[in-house]
Amino acid sequence: MILLGSSGSIGKNVAFLAMKYGIKLDALACKTDYKELNSQISKFNPKFVYIEDNKLKNLVEHSRVFTSKDGIDKFLEACYDEFGSTVVINSLVGFSGLRPSLVSQKLGFKLALANKESLVAGGKFLDTKSINPIDSEHFGLKFLLKNRPAVKKMIITASGGAFYDMHINELEFVTAKSALKHPNWSMGAKITIDSATMANKLFEVLEAYHLYGIKDIDAFIERTSCIHALISFMDGSTTAHISRTDMKLAIAHAIGLEEKEILEPIDILSLKNISFNTINLKKYPIFTLKKDVLNNPDLGVIINAANEEMVYKFLNNEISFLDINRAVFKSLDKFGSVKIDDEDTVFEIDKKVREFCKGF
């Protein structure tokens, strides 16, 4: 198995399960955290490792280290030459995860995908039917689809993020520090901000479309985050996927551990305050784009690039929280008519949108 993004939250959970169940990690890749990478090297003895930052190469305790100077394509090609068609877990953060997803499928790897930007920006160029999704909502949908009648509607849930109980007028002045306090999940900084703006849920709607080919997809607020997904079927029945807020379950199913005891089941008697609410579109304006992205999934490239660029500006205290959405809508005004017919155009538009957003 090849693990991309080994030092992140998902990557560490994959490593935990691999260690617990004796699964070999043949190759590891991360961005800059060489200390965590070295720790994983000592535990798993991988054949190849990759660290994005070339300046850190000499700090990695391994004889076969690839960096951005070589390119992650070369790293994956070396892995394929050595291991053949194995599983690639892509848990990289951001748009940088798209190219490894494309390359992995072209080489013939089985793709287990936690990198949502791969689908948001490049879903039309991926074989989505062969992807194992590592995301609580999409894993929940996949689980519910097994041996079921025709689907009428899919529903995913959102916690509402860090600012759900805050008045709209207060959002202009919130800080990155306060935005990172997610009520239920422990996640990386970028996805936690996306949860607070509801960009994460917009992306997950588009991911669900690419994965399952259904446009009748909605999202509702469910504050406990224990109900991850629901499906309404043509026969009038609705099923829900309920589990603890722990990504190990989705990971386990993606790597063949579905028969193992991964999590303690939720105590059903403890579920006393479950309720669903619609998403407040005034408070979360980015979610007004749901119909637009389902009708024109190419818009995902623009929204993702603008959002990603502005989230990091917000985390660096360069802009206000509400500037994230403002930049997304202005980027759509400027680039929204673009047609994307090939992979190269995805990367070209991404670059242009980021340059445009640097002016904010």
UniProtKB/Swiss-Prot annotation:
Keyword annotations from UniProtKB, A to Z: Isoprene biosynthesis, Manganese, Metal-binding, NADP, Oxidoreductase
Keyword Cell membrane in annotation: no
EC number: 1.1.1.267
Signal sequence bounds: none
Co-factor requirement: Mg(2+); Mn(2+)
Catalysed conversion reaction: 2-C-methyl-D-erythritol 4-phosphate + NADP(+) = 1-deoxy-D-xylulose 5-phosphate + NADPH + H(+)
Family, per entry: Belongs to the DXR family.
Chain's role: Catalyzes the NADPH-dependent rearrangement and reduction of 1-deoxy-D-xylulose-5-phosphate (DXP) to 2-C-methyl-D-erythritol 4-phosphate (MEP).
Official protein name in the record: 1-deoxy-D-xylulose 5-phosphate reductoisomerase
Record lineage: Bacteria, Pseudomonadati, Campylobacterota, Epsilonproteobacteria, Campylobacterales
